[in-house]
Amino acid sequence: MSKIGLFVGTTTGKTEEAAEKIKEEFGGDDVVTIHDISEASPEDFDGYQNVIIGCPTWDVGELQSDWSGFYSEELDNVKFTGKKVAYFGTGDQIGYADNFQDAMGILEEKITGLGGTTIGSWSTEGYDHEDSKAVKNGKFVGLALDDDNQADLTDERIKEWVKQLKTEFGV
């Protein structure tokens, strides 16, 4: 089994594409296994001490549909105590400036309440948004990606974030 479980939901494919880039930056299948949250069960989290959650913000500050279903039906049954959890999200900071990356913040708050330890916070510098549920103590709770307005920064952001996570995960 790989060292990191990456659980992702996607509608347009952008979040899944980012997940693949994150996996490759870590070193591929030997290190990261990607799980589609629409097909995942709470038991799929059991084998991992290191977890990455990937979710786009959908509509106006909402969870993407696959995550919404898992959130309401399954998330409370995941044993997060003792797990390090990193988050990344995709969104549009210009079109949805008042709720950029809210889904990441919604999931982080819930998972922290279930015992997960958040790692991988990310600076808000270089972003142009008004508000976000994903900002705590002046930083995003995880990596914020915006392929609608800053696609040219995505690869470098992923590279830097994974470098940070390798240290924080201890892998």
Swiss-Prot record:
InterPro entries in the cross-refs: Flavodoxin (IPR050619), Flavodoxin/NO_synth (IPR008254), Flavodoxin_lc (IPR010086), Flavoprotein-like_sf (IPR029039)
Q: Which UniProt keywords apply?
A: Electron transport, Flavoprotein, FMN, Transport
| Domain Flavodoxin-like stretches | 4-166
Q: Which cofactor does it need?
A: FMN
Q: Name one GO molecular function term.
A: FMN binding
Q: Does the keyword Flavoprotein apply?
A: yes
Q: Which Pfam families match?
A: Flavodoxin_1 (PF00258)
Concerning its family, UniProt says: Belongs to the flavodoxin family.
Record's function text:
Low-potential electron donor to a number of redox enzymes.
Name of this chain's protein: Flavodoxin
